[in-house]
Amino acid sequence: MQNYWSNNLGSSRRWLMFALGTTLSWGVWGALIEIPEKLGFPATLGYSVWALTMIPCAILALRSDNWRLALHREAWVFGSLIGFLGAGGQLILFEALRSGPAFIVFPIVSLYPAITIILSLWLLKEQASTRNWIGICLALPAIALLSYVAPNDTLISGYTWLFLAMGVFLMWGLQAYFMKLASDRMPSESMFFYMTLTGVLLIPIAVTMTDFSQPINWSFTGPY
């Protein structure tokens, strides 16, 4: 199967530039994501807007690859699986936060890279040096500590939220692993297209999860 990534990617360290770019982009996204909800626009509807904004990005991605969409079975299976794991995990996270404490939910979910690391070392036979292992062992607890939210007086009942949080932890870890696995089987542009498609398909579920009995900011300041 043709490898769509450049053979010189690892040697030139371009992957590090992309990883840092992703970290920066997701960091900005994480800093801004709570603003619409604080302005009265529910997170579930925020998901719907987010999924729709992926459409022009998917179009630009396909255009950059001369409109070549991978249609073989591995492409749409991996692409759809990655999309459902990511977007579905986000919807489950909303439900976990409704009944569970954020100061426990977020540290659990934030450790999902552990799943990706274990699967990559075990199934993909990737090698990690002693220095890599030191970095991993320092990074994982750091992620959990940075994700910690101070407890409040919210009454906690039952453990459904805990199973939901563990589900998100597992889904996002698997998503990152399958993204790595799929990168050798399909172009990243096609992968993003299928991720967009599955994200949009989950919009009706996000809408049904919305509590419309509460006041919603439908003005431009809400979804914007």
Segments (PLM) and residue ranges:
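Juxtamembrane helix-loop boundary signature in multi-pass membrane transporters
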Residues: 1-21, 114-170
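C-terminal ends of transmembrane helices
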Residues: 4-7, 58-70, 114-130, 174-185
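Hydrophobic alpha-helical transmembrane segments of multi-pass integral membrane proteins
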Residues: 13-18, 41-63, 77, 138-141, ...
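Loop-to-transmembrane-helix transition segments
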Residues: 14-22, 67-92, 160-168, 214-224
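Hydrophobic/small/kink-forming positions within alpha-helical transmembrane segments
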Residues: 23, 27, 31, 59, ...
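Membrane-interface helix termini and inter-helical loops of multi-pass transporters
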Residues: 30-43, 67-69, 95-99, 147-158, ...
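Structural motif at transmembrane-helix junctions in multi-pass transporters
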Residues: 38-45, 91-108, 184-190
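Specific alpha-helical transmembrane segments that line the substrate/conduction pathway
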Residues: 48-52, 97-124
